[in-house]
Amino acid sequence: MYSANGHFKKHWQNYVKTWFNQPARKTRRRIARQKKAVKISPRPTAGTLRPIVHGQTLKYNMKVRSGRGFSLEELKAAGIPKKLAPTIGIAVDHRRRNRSLEGLQTNVQRLEDLQGQLVVFPRRASRSRLVILPPRNCLTATQVHGAYMPIEREKHQLILSKVLKKMKSFNAYAKLRVERTNERHIGARMKRAAEAEKEEKK
């Protein structure tokens, strides 16, 4: 329903949202980024290293993205103590669980690659077990700007072929639904089959 008249609250002018501060806010954010980059130098501007994870839900689980932090299992497999990891630029998420071997191996390899490239300027050289450079080298070290060790997504190659009758009759969505239902009921069906077998033996 449309009305030609303006249906406003009383004193509505006092509650109008304005965006006059937007350009200044943009400038403030940029200056803050620059100050932070100087403060954390020679550490990378992108911050800590994040793991490669799959998105949640059926819609996004085929896509990989950066996660919150490496799991304790991944750190252990890579031989990095969990207390040391945050001090050398590795994000840690103690709540994350590894649900697949492939995911675990991918992130362990990522940590090992980082260890191969990592250079540490420790406060106390005697306590570090990693590659150490003298403090004077810290002044000449260059800072990495932007993403480092970026996630490389696989590009699937398309193969063209003729559309066959079998392809037209195949209902992909229905097939996926059936397989998902089978997966959900597998436990109950196995239990029922075991009970039926037990009854037959009697």
Curated annotation (Swiss-Prot):
Statement: the UniProt record of this protein carries the keyword Lyase: no
Entry keywords, A to Z: Ribonucleoprotein, Ribosomal protein
Gene Ontology BP annotations: translation
PROSITE patterns tied to this protein: RIBOSOMAL_L13E
Gene Ontology molecular functions: RNA binding; structural constituent of ribosome
InterPro entries for this protein: Ribosomal_eL13, Ribosomal_eL13_CS
One Pfam family it belongs to: Ribosomal_L13e
Coiled-coil residue windows: none
GO cellular-component term (any): cytosolic large ribosomal subunit
Superkingdom of the source species: Eukaryota
Family under the similarity heading: Belongs to the eukaryotic ribosomal protein eL13 family.
Protein name: Large ribosomal subunit protein eL13
Source species of the chain: Nicotiana tabacum
Gene: RPL13
